[in-house]
Amino acid sequence: MDGMIAMLPAPLQQLSSHIDFQGQKVAERTYQVILTLAGIIGFFVGYSTQQLSYAMYTVMGAAVFTALIILPPWPFLFRKNPIVWQTPIEEQEASSSSDNEKKDKKKETKKTK
């Protein structure tokens, strides 16, 4: 993804391209609803006019409309719930705590035997 962003012009590289997990859920649901409705509407348009091309144009137009709504990471739709990451622990603390955990596990297994 970073390689694709690097190919963009400089002003576009400044835009954020990430959405949060809740935003992904909203985007997926919006995509499903719009395209399902477009399929139903396209079917009736094609049936009433007896033109398959009208049905296809209806669905393709809805697909373009959906892409315009879903693809940009709109901050008011898809980035409302940012992910809060835990701060990384230092290596010494991590290794000493994992050593202590291993010792505790060994003690527990000896006690149970």
From Swiss-Prot:
Name of the protein in its database record: Signal peptidase complex subunit 1
Transmembrane portions of the chain: 33-53, 58-78
UniProt organism field: Caenorhabditis briggsae
Residue ranges of the region described as Disordered: 89-113
Keyword line: Endoplasmic reticulum, Membrane, Transmembrane, Transmembrane helix
GO biological process, one term: signal peptide processing
Cytoplasmic side: 1-32, 79-113
Primary gene name: spcs-1
Cellular localization per UniProt: Endoplasmic reticulum membrane
Entry membrane topology: Multi-pass membrane protein
Protein role: Component of the signal peptidase complex (SPC) which catalyzes the cleavage of N-terminal signal sequences from nascent proteins as they are translocated into the lumen of the endoplasmic reticulum. Dispensable for SPC enzymatic activity.
Pfam families: SPC12
